[in-house]
Amino acid sequence: MGDAKSIETIEAEIVDEFSLFDSWEDKYEYIIDMGKKLPPLSTEFKKDENKIKGCQSTVWMHSDIKNGKVYYEADSDAMIVKGLVSLLIRVFSGQPPEAVINAPVKFIDDIGMTSHLAQTRSSGLRAMIKQMKLDALAWKTKVSPQ
Amino acid sequence: MPLTTAIGYDVYALRKQFPILQRELKGNPLVYFDNAATSQKPKVVIDALVHYYSHYNANIHRGIHTLAEEATAAYEATRETVRKFIGASSVEEVIFTRGTTESINLVSNTWGRANIKAGDEIIISTLEHHSNIVPWQMLAEEKGAVLKVVPITDEGEFIFEAFEKLLSDKTKLVSVVHASNALGIINPVKEIITAAHKAGAVVMVDGAQSTVHLDIDVQDLDCDFFAFSSHKLYGPTGTGALYGKKALLEAMPPFHGGGEMIKEVSFEKTTYNDLPYKFEAGTPNIADTIAMKYAIDFINSIGKENIRMHEDELLSYATESLKAIDGLHVKGDVQHKVSVVSFVIDGIHPQDIGILLDNQGIAVRTGTHCTMPLMQCLNVTGTTRASFAMYNTKEEIDLLVKGIHKVKKMMA
C-alpha cells in the first residue's frame, strides 16, 4: 500500500485481483477475509459521532491527516460490509484529500459489487463513501484555508 | 407426490399458477421466503389487472357509460368479497385504503383526533410494527395523550396480566397486531378486545400478517377497527381495507377531502357522502382493488384451512431443521404462530446471512423488520426471517438449511 500509488492504480490492482475469482463464493470469501483482516478501530473512535448508520448494519469511521495525506480507519458490525470498507480504505488511505474528493470510485462496479451500493442494501457503504469524501473535504479546507 | 396431509393439496400444481416461481436467480431456482413482506401473485391476479386495463378501464361511480358501469360493478364486487372474507356485517363497513398503514393512519387522524384528549391513554404492544406505533405516537404528541406499551416475555409473547394492569378508565384506545411480522407470534386478540371493551376502550387490530393465514371474523372478534393489505394475501400492492363498526365510522370526520367523498359542495359548506365513500376521496386504486377480489377468490378456492395445514407443516419442519443447526437460535419459538421463523446465528450479522443466501437464490428478510423496539427488547440488532406461503415446499426449506451451512462455512 505504497503512498506513491495513485487511486487509479490501486483500483486497477483490486479489479485485477478480483478477475482471478471464477465463483461468487471465492469472491465473497476474499471480501470476508479482508473484513477479518481490517485492523481494529481504536475504541476511542468507536462512538456515536463516528457512526455511519445503514438500515441493517453500522460502520464506524475515523480519519486523520498526516503530511498532507488523509488516513482512514473503520469498523463495521457486518463482515461483508467490513470487507468492502477495507477495500475503500486501501484505495483512499494515504491519498491527498483532493484525490479522494475527485475519485469516481468505479472499482466497486468493476468487481461486480454494484448491488452493495444499491438503495435496497442500505448497507451504509454508499454513506461510507460519501463520508470519506466529506472528511477529505474537511481536511482539505483545514489544511489550506481559503 | 403430494407433500402435505391436506387432502388434494398439491403444492407442485399450485406453484405452476405463480409465474414468478419459475424464475431462476443467479443460476439457482428461486426460493422465495419473504412472504411476510409481500407474497407472490398467481396468474389469475395478474390476468385480472391486464384484463381490466385492456377491456374496461374507466373511472368508477360517476360515469354512465358501459365501461364505467363495468368497472364500478367489479370494484364493488371486491368490497362484497372483502366483507365476506373478514365477516363484516355490511359493505358500508369496508373502506378501501392503500393498505394497513393507511388504514391505521386513517383511524388515528379521524377517530383519534376527534376522540383523544390530553391525559388519555393509548395502549399498544411491544410486538408492533412501526406502522402501528408511529401514527399513535404522532397523535399522542399532538393531543398530550400517553402511549402505553404492553411488555412481552423473553420468548416474545404478549403478557396479558400486564395488559390488564395497564387498562384503566383513562384508556381510550388499544391497537394491537394480530400476528407479529417479525416473529410470527399470534396475539390473543379476542381476549384483548373483551378486556379492553370492559374498560371502555375502542380496539383496533392490525391484521397485516394474520389475514392471509387465519380465519378472520370481525364480528366474532368484536374489534372496532381491523386493517389489512392486499399484497400480503397474493393480491396487488397499493390496496387494502379498513373495517370499522358502522356507528363509529358514521360518527368519524372524513380523512381526505376531494371528489367521491362528498354529497354536495358549495364554497360555504360541503356535505359528506355516505359510508363507505365518505372515506374514499379521489379516484381510488381501481385496477388493484378489482384484482384483490381474484386473490381472495383464489385463497377461498384452495381453502384457508388447507393452506394453514400446509403452512403449519412447513413451519414446524423449518423450525426443527433450523434449530438443529449449531449456533442458530430461533426467536419467538412459541406454539401459536403464523408461518414465520425468525432466527439469529452466533457471531454472524443478519446482513451477511441475507447477502450470502441471496447468492444461492434464497430470498429471506434480514434486519429489524420495522420493529426496532421489539428488536431492542429481544436484545438483538436484527434477525433473519423466513416466512412461508401456500406455494413453499419442504425441499425449499432443505435448500435454506443447506444454504445456511454454506454461510457458516464461508464466514468461519
What residues fall within each predicted segment?
Chain A
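A short, ordered amphipathic alpha-helix with a cationic face
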Residues: 2-5, 75-77
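N-terminal intrinsically disordered, cationic/polar leader segments
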Residues: 4-14, 20-58, 65-66, 106-143
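Conserved short-loop catalytic and cofactor-binding motifs
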Residues: 15, 72, 76, 116
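Secondary-structure capping and boundary motifs in well-ordered enzyme cores
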Residues: 53-54, 76-80
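Conserved interaction-surface patches within small, structured recognition/assembly domains
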Residues: 62-78, 89-92
